[in-house]
Amino acid sequence: MEFPHSVLLVVLIIATFAISNLVQAEEDQEGFISLDCGLPPNEVSPYIEPFTGLRFSSDSSFIQSGKIGKVDKSFEATTLKSYMTLRYFPDGKRNCYNLIVKQGKTYMIRATALYGNYDGLNISPKFDLYIGANFWTTLDAGEYLSGVVEEVNYIPRSNSLDVCLVKTDTSTPFLSLLELRPLDNDSYLTGSGSLKTFRRYYLSNSESVIAYPEDVKDRIWEPTFDSEWKQIWTTLKPNNSNGYLVPKNVLMTAAIPANDSAPFRFTEELDSPTDELYVYLHFSEVQSLQANESREFDILWSGEVAYEAFIPEYLNITTIQTNTPVTCPGGKCNLELKRTKNSTHPPLINAIEFYTVVNFPQLETNETDVVAIKDIKATYELNRITWQGDPCVPQKFIWEGLDCNSKDALTLPRITSLNLSSTGLTGNIAAGIQNLTHLDKLDLSNNNLTGGVPEFLASMKSLSFINLSKNNLNGSIPQALLKREKDGLKLSVDEQIRCFPGSCVITKKKFPVMIVALVSSAVVVILVVLVLIFVFKKKKPSNLEDLPPSSNTPRENITSTSISDTSIETKRKRFSYSEVMEMTKNLQRPLGEGGFGVVYHGDINGSSQQVAVKLLSQSSTQGYKEFKAEVELLLRVHHINLVSLVGYCDERDHLALIYEYMSNKDLKHHLSGKHGGSVLKWNTRLQIAVDAALGLEYLHIGCRPSMVHRDVKSTNILLDDQFTAKMADFGLSRSFQLGDESQVSTVVAGTPGYLDPEYYRTGRLAEMSDVYSFGIVLLEIITNQRVIDPAREKSHITEWTAFMLNRGDITRIMDPNLQGDYNSRSVWRALELAMMCANPSSEKRPSMSQVVIELKECIRSENKTQGMDSHSSFEQSMSFDTKAVPSAR
């Protein structure tokens, strides 16, 4: 975007200068970030820009590098205060601003560069802009004397956002303004990618640019007009209350064709003929039509009808947008509004926005690693020019002294090596190092570090090499770290802090005698306590330890293994067998039967709290010790997407687990359609998938120690009365063997069809085994096919899906019960994700965190389609994609 330099100041005065507006404007900037780049330290910050009412702050707190410049005096008379200064970056390849934002919130990011011949060289600086690790755009700052503005809508993946300037040739990058504006998350939605502003017009013969405070989102609306048009307007304020909040004075004017019987035509040239566009058309009737008058027209894109018989509402906004990105043949976009036979008035339009799609595929470094390395940077006050932006990516900008790895495009990069040798470090070894959980090599040698060698180094299991030599460390090396060294860790330290057994001299005084005496006394006390405990236990035979074991439980598995009664949590959730019989009304209502036993419906004390009681079958082969361990484990697992354990029964030969009751049964039940229920809609299926993925993500990274489900399948995804999905049987599958499948290895557990082939082959269990099984479930959700069907040519669901994908026909892959009611982009995205999860190689599968992110993007894409009600007076949707069947990607 570009604005004419000679009229910039006058335009903004005409469009925005009103005292009442400025007072209101100062109150309406919540969430705004407005940085005046290069504002001198001796000037007031923040300050109010007198002509716009925007509150600007110095950028000095948001970047560690750069120098201050000022535009040539010839520009001062017609330049706003915020454009007078700039920050330029003669040093380093990449220089980055770091901003605090809200993860998942949509922001409009705007970068403005007014060269103003600040360096007296009269050149055209050209450089790249990056958001985080991803290329955003190339900014040619000398192309327009008036300055260049670049905007993009972006959703941060963390609470920290980097905007980077990257040198691409001999010219020096610089920036005049950097601004962030929060947007509503339900506006400007895409199936994938972000929206880069290409043009934003309001159709008027005015010369005024409309911006803040008229536009509360601080979008910049340029006027445009053509000799083939005629302007009409109203003095009344229209209703602009849809998600886009187009300024009211934008909607007070409209353009119609100069010839009433002719179509209205609008053309736009793209920068590249391959660009994909999202188009937003804003309409509001500005004339009060009589009962016998009408304004009705068709909307055509590139000669094809995209919307028929549209009628704008009087003084009420309607936004029509593309559901999917569109292209322009030869790079020339043609919009045509053609009146219908029923219309007495020509078509009109008030405003139009064009956005090109820009993709940000590179994942940023794991947030835990980023926080840790920034903590280390702050601890040692490191000011390396390369230590800006993302630590690991892009690879060409990796921070000096770091090595990182990333398995594939769906795996977050991790820091694996930190080399701060000979960098003048002082103080203690930084505690933040322990948070680099994938660190393999650590080199802090040849510095001035003091203090002791920290214990946490021994607990960093990924470390294979540590060099702490040539420092001023004192004390001794922790014994745990010495043990790690014996086990293969390469440890380099100065000799004065090494203390091998037998090498440390101890003064021979009376201390050894005292130590022997103390140890002897302690031994006597311990023996006495043990005897008393033994006697006490003999007098209390009613304890759980001394009850008869269940018929199939070896005695050695019971001794001293009862669930700890010292935990209040455990006591509160323990039920007697008589209470179990009471809550189930003597096992009156069975809900189902699995490999572990029968599940019964129940309620606690006749209350409204319904429960599902799983009684351990006498034929089950698990041991009491495993049952105890699972109960202790399940009692500490709490997540909204995991079926919660209400309590348990542990009495003689009666073992039971009591779960919350899930009234809508399981996912498989609803997909099968055999029980007369309604068909699950596509967006409901996606939400169920997200819920289940969140539950698994919690097991993998939210639990300590982490857990692997081992039996992810559609029957283990239960649904409550609100159709919130919760994973079930996420603990017992580790400890129990299936009674009906005793031939399955005691090492490998799971359900045929869902079982990770790599886990089955190697016996090595990891979180990626759950990811594979989840991929199979996702394919079930998409296709409603049986996981294994011998009647099919391709019996396994992954083989069948791959076969159908090669034929490129998505309608034959999708569940026919959906009857085509879905957004094809969200389907393709979900399908690709499912196939990645079900990849035979675990290294090529995404993590559950990545699965959650991708599924949420699918939901955003689908909701964007479903949320645009065709009967709404505020917003209607339009699809320029006229193909009924998408081609294979």
From Swiss-Prot:
PROSITE patterns cross-referenced by the UniProt entry: PROTEIN_KINASE_ATP, PROTEIN_KINASE_DOM, PROTEIN_KINASE_ST
Phosphotyrosine carried by residues: Y659, Y759
CDD domains per the UniProt record, alphabetical: STKc_IRAK (cd14066)
Positions of modified residues (Phosphothreonine): T746, T751
Stretches for region Disordered: 544-566, 863-889
Family of this protein: Belongs to the protein kinase superfamily. Ser/Thr protein kinase family.
UniProt protein name: Putative receptor-like protein kinase At3g46340
Organism: Arabidopsis thaliana
